[in-house]
Structures are given as C-alpha cells and as structure tokens.
C-alpha cells in the first residue's frame, strides 16, 4: 500500500534537509484547549474540549528569534456547549488560525518595535489585532450573536441583548 505523506517506514533515515524544512517556523496543526481561547466561559463544558487549529510552531535556529504569526484569520467551528443540569446545544465558536509565520526578534525587543496599543484592557480574548495595521476586530461574529438572539456590540465585541 502507498504510504501517506510524512509517514516513515520503521528505522528509515530522514535526510537533513527534510528534518530542517519540517522543523523550521511554519503554521502547523495543533490541538488547542477551548478554555485557553475562552477563559471566561467556565460555566460550560465543551465537546470536544480542544480543537485543531493552524498555529505557528517550529524552530528559528537563533536564540534571539521566535516563531510568530504574521497573518491570521478567524475560523468558525461548531462546538457542543454543555451547561451542567441545564442542557446543551451545538453553537458556533470563532477561533484564530495562523496562515503565515516568521522568525522575529523575541518579545523584549518586539515590544519597543510594536507601536500597537492593546485593543482593550479588559477582555482581551474578545479581540483580534492585526500586527501590521494595529486594526482591532471582534472574535465574535454577528451571525454567532444572532444565533443566540443577540446582536454584536462592535465597541465591546460582546453579544448584547438587542435594544428596543
């Protein structure tokens, strides 16, 4: 049977350039705990409890550099949200994926280079910021809020009750 890409036969030697290319800084699928992305939603149990996301990972081959995202986008996934003793429903949740990664100077140096102020002092997890333009956008989507009979507040990025 033909082998899947990346699959190795037992005791096969992997060539240096293959090892180097596959270990260098790049977007790679990682399993991310939903509570890491939504730390305030402790009243729910999520099924699944983690999701596969493309995130930057790998080596930069220089101690002063780190692998960081240079392009990101949101992806919406259907997740079961369970509220113990109250019920469950499948709803949409938005997650950040990395589409491009680069080796950049580590945070101490990057902090002076980063002219962007934070999107919000409180509830930082509700916002996504473009590192190039400093533009802030909401992780929540209008359709996600509407599915819960709520509307997206663009200023706070929260789903609020519609005003009458």
UniProtKB/Swiss-Prot annotation:
Q: Which cysteines are joined by disulfide bonds?
A: 25-67, 56-101, 60-103
| Keywords associated with the record | Angiogenesis, Developmental protein, Differentiation, Disulfide bond, Glycoprotein, Growth factor, Mitogen, Secreted
Q: Per the annotation, which location comes first and is thus the protein's main one?
A: secreted
Q: Which organism is it from?
A: Cavia porcellus (Guinea pig)
Lineage of the organism: Eukaryota, Metazoa, Chordata, Craniata, Vertebrata
Assembly and partners?
Homodimer; disulfide-linked. Also found as heterodimer with PGF. Interacts with NRP1. Interacts with BSG.
Q: What is this protein called?
A: Vascular endothelial growth factor A
The entry's function note states: Growth factor active in angiogenesis, vasculogenesis and endothelial cell growth. Induces endothelial cell proliferation, promotes cell migration, inhibits apoptosis and induces permeabilization of blood vessels. Binds to the FLT1/VEGFR1 and KDR/VEGFR2 receptors, heparan sulfate and heparin. Binding to NRP1 receptor initiates a signaling pathway needed for motor neuron axon guidance and cell body migration, including for the caudal migration of facial motor neurons from rhombomere 4 to rhombomere 6 during embryonic development. Also binds the DEAR/FBXW7-AS1 receptor.
Kindly indicate whether the keyword Disulfide bond belongs to this entry.
yes
Question: Which top-level group of life is the source organism from?
Answer: Eukaryota
A Gene Ontology cellular component where this protein is annotated is: membrane
Which residues does the record list as glycosylated? 74
Under the heading InterPro entries, the entry gives: Cystine-knot_cytokine, PD_growth_factor_CS, PDGF/VEGF_dom, PDGF/VEGF_growth_factor, VEGF_C, VEGF_C_sf
Where is the protein localized? Secreted
Q: Which SUPFAM superfamilies does the annotation name? A: Cystine-knot cytokines (SSF57501), Heparin-binding domain from vascular endothelial growth factor (SSF57593)
Show the PANTHER family listed in the entry: VASCULAR ENDOTHELIAL GROWTH FACTOR, VASCULAR ENDOTHELIAL GROWTH FACTOR A, LONG FORM
Q: Where are the transmembrane segments?
A: none
Q: Which GO terms describe its biological process?
A: induction of positive chemotaxis; motor neuron migration; positive regulation of angiogenesis; positive regulation of cell division; positive regulation of endothelial cell migration; positive regulation of endothelial cell proliferation; positive regulation of focal adhesion assembly; positive regulation of mast cell chemotaxis
> Recorded GO terms, molecular function?
chemoattractant activity; growth factor activity; heparin binding; vascular endothelial growth factor receptor binding
Xref: PROSITE patterns = PDGF_1, PDGF_2
| Family the entry assigns | Belongs to the PDGF/VEGF growth factor family.
